[in-house]
Amino acid sequence: MSKDDLIQFTGTVLELLPNATFRVKLENDHIIIAHTSGRMRKNRIRILLGDKVTVEMTPYDLTKGRVIHRH
């Protein structure tokens, strides 16, 4: 699967979970579990409750995603 196959959504962080994982409410009112991308971990970008984030998801599993940007 290439990068072109990934779907991006904007959402809001609802809950902070262990191991850099978050419960995110997307703009289409779906709630998913998302983890922090490797570059965000490497650069120590903090994500807090209520932050607007961009989430990248695969079309095969629409319940999990990866946070790639914090607004």
UniProtKB/Swiss-Prot annotation:
Presence of keyword rRNA-binding: yes
Please verify whether the record's keywords include Manganese.
no
> Record's superkingdom?
Bacteria
This protein's UniProt keywords: Cytoplasm, Initiation factor, Protein biosynthesis, RNA-binding, rRNA-binding
Report the Pfam families cross-referenced here. eIF-1a
Q: Cellular component per GO?
A: cytosol
Q: Where is the S1-like domain?
A: 1-71
| Places the protein is found | Cytoplasm
Q: Name one GO molecular function term.
A: rRNA binding
List the NCBIfam families: infA
**Matching HAMAP family:** IF_1
Q: How does it assemble?
A: Component of the 30S ribosomal translation pre-initiation complex which assembles on the 30S ribosome in the order IF-2 and IF-3, IF-1 and N-formylmethionyl-tRNA(fMet); mRNA recruitment can occur at any time during PIC assembly.
Task: Give the UniProt family note.
Answer: Belongs to the IF-1 family.
What is its biological role? One of the essential components for the initiation of protein synthesis. Stabilizes the binding of IF-2 and IF-3 on the 30S subunit to which N-formylmethionyl-tRNA(fMet) subsequently binds. Helps modulate mRNA selection, yielding the 30S pre-initiation complex (PIC). Upon addition of the 50S ribosomal subunit IF-1, IF-2 and IF-3 are released leaving the mature 70S translation initiation complex.
How is this protein named in the record?
Translation initiation factor IF-1
| Biological source species | Rickettsia prowazekii (strain Madrid E)
